């Protein structure tokens, strides 16, 4: 008897030409139900309806269609097992050779904000059962769960009997498909009902095999959600992104987006932001009245470290900005858009990776961040909650001036993205010195203050953590710093406040720490 394919798909892309070739080239009979059967019949493809095949009607509003011994027996039966052969004959089962199933669009349903009841109805039961049955019996049954697999299956079939290794690969992809589906459902229930899960489960498809990891001897893979975030970015030029590129791009964009997207129809003075980043630390940042000026201001902070760095913008890149960018060696430039003339200028630098990532391509605010440790995983809320200035306290006799308040706010936002211990010196809405990743706070302050030098006069200082002693304030005074912003919370806060008062320095305490490791 000719082979039998069970076809039940929510995503009907390519299903008609695929089934047509199954019938015409390989003499398959098609077994189907519901919307898939209707779709194939309308395309003049002969279909055996599941209800006729099982002699059982669909019940419970379509909740039960394929959950039947004639379906699962035909899929799970081992062709060479004598006991199975007897059961097949005794129960009048017909063997199913190919299962083509993809599932109700649960993720899409919940992303659209559907009601609880509607989302529940989009939890597929029969589909995963058929997929798992076929994957378990992959020695005898092939299983396809995605339209992207159809063409390869046809090509492999033309070669003759399918190889065991190929069928095992299909089974692997099938189990990953159902695992991903179950993960989406469990995470949705946890989120919707505010329930704490006893297991941390996430599912990300493979995006790309990277050339190597942080170092050439380390293997690296890129997993991610499709059509969102960096996976959806349009790369306009340059080699494939590396592991380090992706880490730096993420940090650069996260930093520049502290100032929001400067959309073309919403541009106002001081909304243009640019950040230059190297080795996961900002080495320059600014907001100004144009993208070009913001970049030049950021570059002034540390032009040496900017060499080979990443540049991020929160606004369109025009030709003037591109002219300034082309004079320095950079790994990547990312922005929400580029003028045509700007692209022509930038593309002269053949090795420059140019990425376009617009506001609507960003994921919703991340819920958690993770770090692997030996034998486990640390999970925390991401540090992306908005800092509310209403909770900030001016704790010194002198209050910051209006300009100083602007600079304190700016420096605080940048400091959040600098590795701890972090100190940022800023003036006129641009960084002039950054001290990153030091084991003590005064050491980070020395680096930042020395980098800024004479520019420190009337500048502001931001610290990601509190001052355990007054030594950082004393050092800041020597360089002419006039205002400081820090979380507070030290047992010796008063010592630092007293030092500020004695030197005429303003101090603002935010009551929120921004460590970054």
UniProtKB/Swiss-Prot annotation:
Its EC number is 2.1.2.3, 3.5.4.10. Keywords: Hydrolase, Multifunctional enzyme, Purine biosynthesis, Transferase. CDD domains: IMPCH. Pfam families: AICARFT_IMPCHas (PF01808), MGS (PF02142). Coiled coil: none annotated. GO terms for biological process: 'de novo' IMP biosynthetic process. Residues 1-145 form the MGS-like domain. Belongs to the PurH family. This is Bifunctional purine biosynthesis protein PurH. The IMP cyclohydrolase activity resides in the N-terminal region. One of its GO terms (cellular component) is cytosol. It comes from Prochlorococcus marinus (strain MIT 9312). It catalyses: (6R)-10-formyltetrahydrofolate + 5-amino-1-(5-phospho-beta-D-ribosyl)imidazole-4-carboxamide = 5-formamido-1-(5-phospho-D-ribosyl)imidazole-4-carboxamide + (6S)-5,6,7,8-tetrahydrofolate; IMP + H2O = 5-formamido-1-(5-phospho-D-ribosyl)imidazole-4-carboxamide. Pathway: Purine metabolism; IMP biosynthesis via de novo pathway; 5-formamido-1-(5-phospho-D-ribosyl)imidazole-4-carboxamide from 5-amino-1-(5-phospho-D-ribosyl)imidazole-4-carboxamide (10-formyl THF route): step 1/1; Purine metabolism; IMP biosynthesis via de novo pathway; IMP from 5-formamido-1-(5-phospho-D-ribosyl)imidazole-4-carboxamide: step 1/1. GO terms for molecular function: IMP cyclohydrolase activity; phosphoribosylaminoimidazolecarboxamide formyltransferase activity. Signal peptide: none annotated.
């Amino acid at each position: 008897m000719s082979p039998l394919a069970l076809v039940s798909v929510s995503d009907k892309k390519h299903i008609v030409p695929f089934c047509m070739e199954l019938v015409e080239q390989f003499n398959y009979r098609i077994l189907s139900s519901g919307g898939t059967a209707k779709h194939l019949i309308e395309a003049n493809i002969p279909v055996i309806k599941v209800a006729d095949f099982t002699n059982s009607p669909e019940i419970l509003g379509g909740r039960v269609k394929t959950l039947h011994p004639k379906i699962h027996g035909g899929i799970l039966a081992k062709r060479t097992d004598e006991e199975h052969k007897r059961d097949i004959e005794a129960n009048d089962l017909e063997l199913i050779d190919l299962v083509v199933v993809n599932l109700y669009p649960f993720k899409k349903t919940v992303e659209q904000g559907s009601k609880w009841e509607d989302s529940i109805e989009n939890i597929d039961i029969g589909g995963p059962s058929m997929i798992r049955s076929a994957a378990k019996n992959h020695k005898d049954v092939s299983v396809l769960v995605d339209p992207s697999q159809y063409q390869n299956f046809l090509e492999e079939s033309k070669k003759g009997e399918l190889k065991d290794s190929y069928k095992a690969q299909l089974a692997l992809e099938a189990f990953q498909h159902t695992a991903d589906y179950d993960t989406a459902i469990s995470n949705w229930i946890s989120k919707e009902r505010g329930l704490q899960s006893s297991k941390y489960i996430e599912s990300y498809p493979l995006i790309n095999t990277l050339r190597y990891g942080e170092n050439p001897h380390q293997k690296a893979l890129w997993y991610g959600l499709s059509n969102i975030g960096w996976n959806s970015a349009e790369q306009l030029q340059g080699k494939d992104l590396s592991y380090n590129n992706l880490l730096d791009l993420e940090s650069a964009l996260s930093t520049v987006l502290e100032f929001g997207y400067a959309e073309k129809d919403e541009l106002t003075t001081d909304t243009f932001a640019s950040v230059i980043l190297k080795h996961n630390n900002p080495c320059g940042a600014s907001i100004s009245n144009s993208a070009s000026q913001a970049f030049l201001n950021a570059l002034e902070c540390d032009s040496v470290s900017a060499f080979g760095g990443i540049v991020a913008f929160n606004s369109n890149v025009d030709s003037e900005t591109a002219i300034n960018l082309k004079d320095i060696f950079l790994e990547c430039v990312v922005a929400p858009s580029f003028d045509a003339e700007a692209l022509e200028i930038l593309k002269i630098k053949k090795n420059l990776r140019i990425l376009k990532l617009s506001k609507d391509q960003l994921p919703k605010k991340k819920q958690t961040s993770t770090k692997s440790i030996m034998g486990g995983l640390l999970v925390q809320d991401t540090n992306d909650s908005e800092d509310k200035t209403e909770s900030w306290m001016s704790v010194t006799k002198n209050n910051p001036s209006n300009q100083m308040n602007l600079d304190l706010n700016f420096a605080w936002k940048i400091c959040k993205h600098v590795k701890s211990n972090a100190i940022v010196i800023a003036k006129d809405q641009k960084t002039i010195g950054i001290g990153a990743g030091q084991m003590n706070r005064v050491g980070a302050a020395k680096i930042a203050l020395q980098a800024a030098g004479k520019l420190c006069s009337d500048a502001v200082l931001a610290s990601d953590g509190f001052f355990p002693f007054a030594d950082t304030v004393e050092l800041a005074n020597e360089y002419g710093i006039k205002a400081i912003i820090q979380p507070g919370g030290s047992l010796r806060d008063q010592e630092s406040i007293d030092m500020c008062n004695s030197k005429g320095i303003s101090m603002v305490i935010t009551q929120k720490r921004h460590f970054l490791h």
